[in-house]
Design a protein with these regions (language model features):
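Generic structural hydrophobic/aromatic packing signal, biased to beta-strands
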Residues: 7, 17, 32, 42, ...
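Long, non-coiled-coil amphipathic alpha-helical linker/lever segments
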Residues: 3-4, 82, 89-140
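Short, surface-exposed, charged/polar-biased interaction segments
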Residues: 28, 74-75, 92, 99-106, ...
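Helical mechanochemical/support elements of P-loop NTPase systems and associated helical scaffolds
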Residues: 3, 13, 50, 67, ...
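Conserved NTPase motor "head" modules and their coupling/switch loops across ABC/AAA+ ATPases, GTPases
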Residues: 117-203
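Conserved NTP-handling cores and scaffolds of large molecular machines
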Residues: 65, 86-93, 104, 111, ...
């Protein structure tokens, strides 16, 4: 793992890290002195303190490399992030996701079969898939809207109003605000439009 001495520039004997932060509406000066072969010194408002005394003094937001995948990776990662969060507050949502996966698998099986008698039942599966998909999409949209209320406020606060953030869930309806029924209809129409392409890819 990383060591404190890793902060020392190559060729230098020590490093001195200084910061100013606010705690309970009061500005606090912090300083850390690190020298090779010596104990680290932590100074708060000009007074040397122990490391334990600084725990909880500076509230930080940590960004790990894997967090960037929410932005840099494809929509599947973002959908999974939303689904995981939603399932924690709405356990029933997990059942809907599982049911959707089963219906989707059955639909794909029918397309692969190329059997006329089985393909004749495809529409009933499209209806089920669209209904579940409409519920899932609308639930994700609703959650994202609520999440953004806090996220936008937080970004505004930590950037002192210099940065703004926004996000929008893109669905087949193409609308920002919809109902589960509208999303269901949009998904059903999309399934019908993409039938030939789905058949070609899965066969």
């Amino acid at each position: 793992g990383a060591k404190d001495t890793d902060f020392i520039k190559q060729g230098s004997l020590f490093t001195d890290i200084k910061c100013v932060f606010e705690k309970s509406d009061r500005k606090v000066k912090g300083e850390i002195k690190i020298a090779d072969g010596r104990r680290k010194e932590i100074i708060k408002d000009g007074v040397k303190v122990r490391s334990a005394e600084m725990v909880g003094q500076i509230n930080t937001v940590l960004f790990y490399p894997e967090h960037l995948s929410l932005i840099k990776s494809g929509p599947e990662i973002r959908r999974k992030f939303l689904d995981t969060a939603i399932c924690q507050i709405k356990p029933g949502f997990f059942r809907i996701l599982n049911e959707y996966s089963k219906v989707l698998a059955q639909r794909n099986f029918l397309l692969k079969s190329q059997r006329k008698d089985m393909l004749e039942t495809l529409d009933s599966w499209d209806i089920k898939l669209a209904k579940l998909g409409g519920i899932i999409t609308n639930t994700r949209k609703t959650y994202l809207e609520k999440l953004l209320v806090f996220a936008e406020k937080t970004v505004d606060e930590i950037s002192s109003g210099k940065e703004k953030m926004t996000a929008e869930y893109q669905s087949y309806s193409g609308k920002k605000t919809t109902s589960a029924e509208e999303e269901e209809k949009a998904l059903y129409n999309k399934l019908k439009e993409s039938f030939s392409e789905d058949e070609r890819l899965l066969c």
